[in-house]
Swiss-Prot record:
Residues that span the membrane, as ranges: none
Pfam families: RuvC
Positions bound to Mg(2+) 2: 68
Lineage: Bacteria, Pseudomonadati, Chlorobiota, Chlorobiia, Chlorobiales
InterPro entries noted in UniProt: RNaseH-like_sf (IPR012337), RNaseH_sf (IPR036397), X-over_junc_endoDNase_Mg_BS (IPR020563), X-over_junc_endoDNase_RuvC (IPR002176)
Protein name: Crossover junction endodeoxyribonuclease RuvC
Top enzyme category: hydrolase
Cofactor: Mg(2+)
Gene Ontology MF annotations: crossover junction DNA endonuclease activity; DNA binding; magnesium ion binding
């Protein structure tokens, strides 16, 4: 199974493509950062994210897309812009025929490190360890995206029975805790 993990942002969007069986043999196929110029209009930046991710989907043909849910801070304009980026990514996934699943940051951290409140440095270290990378990818947007892909593989990507999203709602939590336990017996105490 191949999963494209995305950490969306209006100025920097991290992506990570990971293959794996949902248990322990994970491999990073590609990762990087779509860095956007802040002086370009927001519409142009959203279009660039769509275009670059579309090329990536066409090239690597992931089975699934996993996206981190939005963190809503105090800045309403930032939240709106992030929502537009996420909407473009969801539309791209739908247009490409690739199911999309959402995971909260705490869920990603818990899947990768065992702690929902883990620091970004801990997530980055564990991502590099799980993917047998010689160094930790930078910046955190990239390791977060790889973590989202790993979370999806650990939660639902191990060939376990799962409910497929109909693209009308988010996919987060579709597999459930029971599927995670069955897919990852070595991670449960």
């Amino acid at each position: 199974m191949v999963v494209l993990g995305i950490d969306p942002g209006s100025l920097a969007t991290g992506y990570g493509v990971v293959s794996g069986d949902g248990r322990e043999s994970f491999r990073a196929l590609s990762c990087g950062l779509i860095r956007l110029h802040p002086r370009k209009s927001h519409a142009v930046r959203v279009g660039e994210i769509y275009r670059e991710l579309s090329e990536l989907i066409g090239e690597l043909k992931p089975d699934r897309v996993a996206i981190e849910t939005a963190f809503v801070g105090k800045n309403v304009q930032s939240a709106l812009k992030l929502g537009q980026v996420r909407g473009a990514i969801m539309a791209l996934s739908f247009n490409s025929g690739v199911p999309i699943f959402e995971y909260a940051p705490r869920e990603v951290k818990s899947a990768v490190t065992g702690r929902g409140g883990a620091a970004k440095e801990q997530v980055a270290f564990m991502v590099a360890s799980m993917l047998s990378l010689s160094s930790v990818p930078k910046p955190f947007d990239v390791t977060d995206a790889l973590g989202v892909a790993l979370c999806d593989l650990l939660r639902c990507g191990g060939g376990q029975k799962e409910r497929q999203t109909d693209m009308k709602g988010s996919g987060g939590g579709l597999c459930g805790w029971g599927d995670f336990v069955r897919a990852s017996p070595d991670r449960v105490l």
